[in-house]
Regions:
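N-terminal non-catalytic accessory region
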Residues: 30-193, 197-252, 388, 395-509
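Aromatic-acidic/polar surface patches that form glycan- and anion
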Residues: 136, 163, 167-170, 372-375, ...
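Serine-dependent carboxylesterase/thioesterase catalytic core
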Residues: 168, 172-346
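N-terminal secretory signal peptides that target proteins for export/translocation
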Residues: 1-5
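Sec-dependent N-terminal signal peptides of Gram-positive bacterial secreted proteins and lipoproteins
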Residues: 6-27
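Cellulosome-associated attachment modules in secreted, modular CAZymes
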Residues: 23-29, 509-562
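Short amphipathic alpha-helical segments that mediate assembly, nucleic-acid/protein binding
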Residues: 140, 258, 291-292, 322-323, ...
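Alpha/beta-hydrolase fold catalytic core
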Residues: 154-161, 165-168, 294-398, 420, ...
């Protein structure tokens, strides 16, 4: 072949090669570790809700709270005088005015469809800026910041709950988000994390749409199995735990000042028995019904009972009894409004279909998550414990994250009652191949739906995402994991952890100060590692930094290495 022909041949070959390469899918040129976008579903009340004119209707504005407090003075005065009828009429009116903008009709539809979150961010955080997306009246959580640092603000999305919409509507919104993210980012899957009620929405989405579009499922103190407290309330079980009320107030206020005042004056000891007596007092109409029945019928049913999404908070073992109790109150509520029996029946049929569909998902969530894992989707569950919950039901002594009971957020852990242990003779309930008992004797994780993929953090609040140190690190690792993590995946983050409010660190429950290499014992090796870190010769993990600060000064120095 002549040189000219060879040149022509090579030129044609190169041209053909370039032509073929033009048609090779773009994915072939993408990096193997392409970032998977993250969608965070916020919890109940994390976004302010506004009406069609932009007026804040939930959470209550400062002005609304002040007005409510002023309006409550007269009814409270009547209560102290023993005038229960005036007191009940007053508080029912106050509560109904407060909840009316976010209430639902007896068939489960919103009374005011124009009420929605103050802002819904349909684009990634980068389009608005972190300060905008985490401002006070929306999702003001450091977890967004942590995710942005890990995968870039262009790959993080946040969904705010218009929580009085049905779970079916909320799940449909999530599906719309997921499809948009996939199209915009040219990805096959999205990592989804659900916080609090957002976890119940995530569960509903998985039950209705499956997990084919989901790379990672992360439950963050999630209500995906309900709340014992709500189950009790929907069954009509109210009980104020005086001994738990002051600790709960102190915990909520992050101070014991108010608790000390209340305890010294014995105000709660005087007020609570009187309140319980009021609830059980029969109405003066001779019906045999009590003031508790009246409050449920005229207030709680319209404020919460008709809201189908809140029924996702009723755990499976409470559900049938709760339906029977609330149905009776709902019927009475509508009868008092002059609604005919046929319309009442039609309303219930429509409402029941909505709540039953979502309840069936909750009742089968273990199987749903197991199937997700089997299909290659990573599933991680995070549950906090050792905090008081609102003490207004018989389950007030359940350990919790301050809002939801730990046995619920963990998907079934066996938990000791608050400030107690399971006992020295307690034996792990199930053999799952490794120890599932917390070193403090409070938790048995073997009874969880996914004991291999469930972590517990002691003393960490329901909505705490403390990013000052490593308080978001484990969560972000789970959201971005390329394969299924287990409680053995990260040595610095075993199954049982503890949050230190003074240092802002999350560390193993068994962590020993000075044990820098985390091998369970303190040796000269630990001193050497601390010195190397001080001299800039060694990098330490967040947990190692936590234990290296042996003298708790807030900084690692040569004194810690001594």
């Amino acid at each position: 072949m002549s040189k000219n022909r060879m040149k022509k041949f090579v030129s044609i070959l190169l041209a053909l090669t370039m032509t073929v390469l033009c048609f090779v899918p773009a994915a072939a040129a993408e990096p193997k570790d392409k970032v998977t976008p993250i969608l965070i579903i916020a919890g109940f009340g994390e976004y302010v809700l506004v009406d069609g004119d932009g007026n804040q209707v939930w959470g209550p504005s400062q002005d609304a709270i002040v007005e409510t407090a002023k309006n409550a003075i007269a009814p409270l005065g009547a209560f102290l005088k023993g005038d229960y009828e005036t007191f009940c009429t007053g508080i029912v009116e106050i509560a109904n005015n407060l909840f009316e903008p976010v209430s639902c009709n007896p068939d489960g539809t919103a009374k005011h469809p124009d009420v929605t979150v103050i802002d819904q961010y349909t684009e990634p955080v980068s389009q608005y800026g972190l300060d905008e997306v985490t401002r006070g009246d929306v999702f003001d959580k450091d977890i967004v910041d942590a995710c942005c640092d890990e995968v870039g603000a262009d790959n993080v999305y946040v969904y705010g709950l218009t929580w009085h919409k049905s779970m079916q509507e909320l799940a449909a919104d999530i599906n719309t988000y997921v499809q948009k993210i996939k199209a915009d980012k040219h990805v096959d899957k999205v990592s989804i994390a659900g916080h609090s009620m957002g976890g119940a929405v995530l569960a509903s989405y998985l039950g209705l749409y499956g997990c084919d579009d989901v790379s990672n499922i992360t439950m963050l103190n999630s209500a995906f199995t309900g709340l014992d407290m709500v189950g009790c309330l929907f069954k009509g079980e109210i009980a104020v735990g005086i001994d738990k009320l002051i600790p709960f107030i102190n915990q909520s206020m992050n101070s014991d000042t108010l608790g000390k005042v209340l305890d010294t004056l014995k105000l709660l000891q005087l007020a609570v028995p009187k309140l319980e007596g009021f609830l059980e007092t029969e109405l003066p109409d001779g019906s045999g019904r009590t003031y508790k029945d009246r409050i449920y019928t005229e207030c709680l049913v319209s404020g919460f009972g008709y809201t189908p999404s809140l029924w996702a908070f009723v755990p499976d073992e409470y559900y049938d009894d709760a339906k029977a109790v609330m149905k009776a109150y709902m019927e009475k509520n509508q009868q008092q409004s002059g609604v005919s029996a046929s319309v009442i029946a039609a309303n219930w049929a429509t409402f029941e279909r909505k709540i039953d569909e979502i309840h069936d998902i909750q009742a089968n969530i273990s199987s749903i998550l197991q199937r997700a894992k089997a299909s290659g989707t990573s599933v991680c569950i995070f549950s906090n414990y050792n905090l008081y919950i609102a003490p207004f039901t018989p389950t007030a002594d359940y350990t919790s994250d301050g809002v939801i009971e730990t046995n619920r957020t963990s998907g079934g852990a066996t938990c000791a009652r608050l400030k107690m242990t399971l006992g020295d003779d307690y034996v792990q309930a199930r053999d799952v191949g490794h120890n599932c008992l917390s070193e403090d004797g409070i938790i048995d994780a073997s009874t969880c739906m996914l004991p291999e993929n469930t972590w517990f953090i002691k003393n960490y609040g329901h909505s705490m995402f403390d990013y000052r140190k490593n308080g978001c690190d484990l969560y972000v690792r789970a959201m971005t994991a390329k394969t299924q993590p287990t409680v053995d995946t990260w040595a610095e983050y075993p199954q049982f952890l503890v949050y230190n409010a003074g240092t802002h660190y999350v560390a193993p429950l068994t962590a020993k100060f000075g044990d820098v290499d985390l091998d369970g014992s303190i040796t000269p090796v630990d001193s050497r590692l601390a010195l190397r870190y001080v001299n800039g010769m060694e990098e330490l993990s967040p947990t190692a930094k936590y234990v290296a600060d042996a003298n708790r000064s807030g900084d690692i120095s040569t004194f810690d290495a001594e």
